[in-house]
Design a protein with these regions (language model features):
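...captures the hydrophobic TM-helix bundle architecture rather than a specific catalytic motif
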Residues: 1-259
Length: 259
């Protein structure tokens, strides 16, 4: 299952396009910009189709189980007393943060660069990469005579990377990273014509509203970590279904509303 095992390439492709525009965009011809940025998103869409196709086979063999691919762990796992200690992961020493949950359980805080594919994320993956590819293709003509052509496509590629990270993240921390990236790109794209006062004002308004959403997201994330002792979607879902937590608990309701 080459597509599933390399699902991390889907967000990486537009990220590479954005990085290329950042460092070399000024020197590139429009044709080259189109090949790099539009090509990256089209490849991401084709790769997404392959990944979803292979996921259908995976789901038949593992009904109800999402596919997860953990690329790197920057906060390790383990058990022990509350505090900070190192843990070995992949031959490297990773920081390990252990805290007490609401019911007094010691819980290691886990944060991965990991990706998850399930029926819901599969639908959104195809939608975002497919529509994103069409937007990129349309923009090659719509923005053809605009100053800052490379900058616009750099923003679009960065937006695709952030949105795909948000969709495929297997934990709340990485999802928050994607959310922040989407907010940043919204600000950059809305304010693309920064010399126009109306565009600058609209971009600032969007930035402020997103920061309000960030506060709620963070509070909801911290509440889930404190209540369940985990930030991975699969573990939180398993604990929620275990029967040890009351569905009508005001804390769960509050965390849901904050998110």
């Amino acid at each position: 299952m080459v597509f599933l095992s390399h699902i991390w390439l889907i967000p990486l492709l537009p990220a590479l396009g954005a990085a290329t525009m950042l460092f070399f965009g000024r020197k590139l011809q429009k044709t080259t910009i189109n090949v790099v940025c539009v090509g990256a998103v089209i490849l991401a869409f084709l790769f997404a189709c392959g990944a979803v196709w292979q996921y259908t086979d995976y789901s038949r063999a593992n009904p109800g189980k999402p596919y997860q691919n953990i690329v790197y762990t920057w906060l390790g796992t383990g058990s022990g007393e509350t505090g900070v200690s190192p843990v070995q992961s992949g031959g490297e020493t990773q920081p390990q943060i252990i805290f007490l949950t609401r019911d007094g359980r010691p819980a290691p805080l886990q944060a991965d660069a990991g990706f998850l594919l399930d029926p819901l994320s599969s639908i959104w993956l195809l939608f975002v990469t497919g529509v994103g590819a069409l937007i990129h293709i349309y923009s090659t003509g719509y923005m053809a005579h605009e100053h800052g052509y490379y900058r616009f496509f750099g923003y679009l590629n960065l937006f695709m990377f952030s949105m795909l990270t948000l969709i495929l993240a297997n934990n709340y921390v990485l999802m928050f990273v994607g959310w922040e990236g989407v907010g940043l790109c919204s600000y950059l794209l809305i304010g693309f014509y920064f010399h126009r006062p109306s565009a600058s004002t609209a971009a600032n308004k969007a930035f402020i509203v997103n920061r309000i959403g960030d506060a709620g997201f963070l509070l909801g994330m911290f509440t889930i970590a404190w209540y369940f002792g985990s930030l991975r979607f699969s573990e939180v879902t398993h604990l929620a279904r275990s029967g040890h937590f009351a569905i009508g608990d005001p804390i769960i309701t509050a965390a849901t509303l904050l998110l």
